[in-house]
């Protein structure tokens, strides 16, 4: 009764007002799964390809070709297949595409179908998505990385790092973690306003004030944590997303906002120093995606005490992750479903990380929708951490609200990851 009888792809708009792909999958028993595909602003060179139309329509960002692939070739290939066989369905679509990066049909087309198939099958099974994907062991609520201050590609200010995040590691429950984050977010807003800074929010709901450098941003966050009544480090830690590929030029890290240029060793030492001066427990993309020597230097220097997350470095790709593990670089992978383009490959990346004692952080993209699938996947994989934006914008809050519901559903079985995510 789980045979796929219909697939409907459509073009909808994401949180930035750009087109994206949404897919409905209908099963023989009438069960329906719907998934919408996110889109990134700072994308790694090794990501699966998001198919865009080009031309004047939507200023070149239309996804009509990807939708056509969903309604045409993909439906013809997997229509009639049993939706329970997720691996076979995903492999069929990957083989149909026939390219190493899903550039013919589009990762946005393949992923939309892949996630919708899983959601339809969960509905047919009478199970929530996290339970269907993760089985009986899915019970860990992730620590949120809450993006409250922005720079880099996410802002028009002098700060070169892309994201400054808070992690409520000392909260007793996910619901409390969300409350703590909200209280700090609003305290920060008041502090910025009092200091004469702009408090408009960016793509991911964080503030983008005109601060001079990373230290100024970190000092504002520390003050806000304390003023909200929490202890920096013990109760609320800090995480960074440097997005270093964005300012890596000719083998150097060029901090245009600060007027500084650092080589790989100096970059590693700078980040390690910051982690010593502030309660920073996680640094994402501290080095450029192909600066393997820099990554090794950073890992040797800070890897025992700080979570070093590879985003552009690994692009949710199990093969690239295995290479990194063999090189001894980083100790964590950021998991973005649209970087790799199918549920099966996403789960493979998480499994590869966990087998090597690397952590995994489930993540949104800067262009999001009301789809809350990644909240379920964070619990399904027991990865213990989720990165899904600030405490503003409904496209971000949809994920937090879904996690609150999941914690409620799990009842006494629910466990908030808390301080288990802290290294050292």
Swiss-Prot record:
Coiled coil: none
Disulfide bonds: none
Keyword Metal-binding: yes
GO-annotated biological processes: glycolytic process
Active site, renumbered: 204 (proton donor), 336 (proton acceptor)
Binding site for (2R)-2-phosphoglycerate: 162, 336, 365-366, 387
InterPro entries, per database record: Enolase (IPR000941), Enolase-like_C_sf (IPR036849), Enolase-like_N (IPR029017), Enolase_C (IPR020810), Enolase_CS (IPR020809), Enolase_N (IPR020811)
CDD domains per record: enolase
Lineage start: Bacteria, Pseudomonadati, Pseudomonadota, Alphaproteobacteria, Hyphomicrobiales
Cofactor info, note text: Binds a second Mg(2+) ion via substrate during catalysis.
Alphabetical UniProt keywords: Cytoplasm, Glycolysis, Lyase, Magnesium, Metal-binding, Secreted
HAMAP family on file: Enolase
Domain of life: Bacteria
Provenance organism: Chelativorans sp. (strain BNC1)
Entry EC no(s): 4.2.1.11
Subcellular location, record wording: Cytoplasm; Secreted; Cell surface
Entry protein name: Enolase
């Amino acid at each position: 009764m789980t045979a796929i009888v219909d697939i409907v792809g459509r073009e909808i708009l994401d949180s930035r007002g750009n087109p994206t792909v949404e897919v409905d999958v209908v099963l023989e028993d009438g069960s329906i799964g719907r998934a919408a595909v996110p889109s990134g602003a700072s994308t790694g060179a090794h990501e699966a390809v998001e198919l865009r139309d080009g031309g004047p329509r939507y200023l070149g960002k239309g996804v009509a070709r990807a939708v056509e692939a969903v309604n045409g070739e993909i439906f013809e290939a997997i229509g009639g297949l049993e939706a329970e066989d997720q691996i076979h369905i995903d492999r069929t679509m990957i083989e149909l595409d026939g390219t190493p990066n899903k550039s013919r049909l589009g990762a946005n087309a393949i992923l939309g179908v892949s996630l919708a198939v899983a959601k339809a099958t969960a509905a047919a099974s009478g199970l929530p998505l996290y339970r269907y994907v993760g089985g009986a062991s899915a019970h860990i609520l992730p620590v949120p990385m809450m993006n409250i201050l922005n720079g880099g590609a996410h802002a028009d200010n002098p700060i070169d790092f892309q994201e400054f995040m808070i992690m409520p590691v000392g909260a007793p429950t996910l619901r409390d973690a969300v409350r703590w984050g909200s209280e700090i977010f609003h305290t920060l807003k008041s502090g910025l306003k009092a200091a004469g800074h702009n408090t408009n929010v960016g793509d991911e709901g964080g503030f983008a004030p005109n601060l001079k450098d990373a230290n100024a941003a970190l000092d504002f966050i520390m003050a806000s944590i304390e003023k909200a009544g929490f202890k920096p480090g013990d109760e609320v830690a800090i995480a960074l997303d440097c997005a270093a590929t964005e300012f890596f030029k000719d083998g150097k890290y060029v901090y245009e906002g600060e007027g500084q240029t650092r080589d790989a060793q100096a970059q590693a030492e700078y980040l390690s120093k910051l982690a010593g001066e502030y309660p920073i427990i996680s640094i994402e993309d501290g080095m450029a995606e192909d600066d393997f020597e820099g990554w090794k230097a950073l890992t040797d220097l800070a890897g025992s005490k700080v979570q070093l997350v590879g985003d552009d470095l690994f692009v949710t790709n199990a093969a690239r992750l295995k290479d990194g593990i063999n090189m001894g670089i980083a100790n964590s992978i950021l998991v973005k479903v649209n970087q790799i383009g199918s549920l099966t490959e996403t789960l493979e990346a998480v499994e590869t990380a966990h087998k090597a004692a690397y952590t995994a952080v489930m993540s949104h993209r800067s262009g999001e929708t009301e789809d809350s699938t990644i909240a379920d996947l964070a619990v399904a994989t027991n990865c213990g951490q989720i990165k899904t934006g600030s405490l503003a914008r409904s496209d971000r809050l949809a994920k937090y609200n879904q996690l609150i519901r999941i914690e409620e559903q799990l009842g006494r079985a629910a466990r908030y990851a808390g301080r288990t995510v802290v290294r050292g």
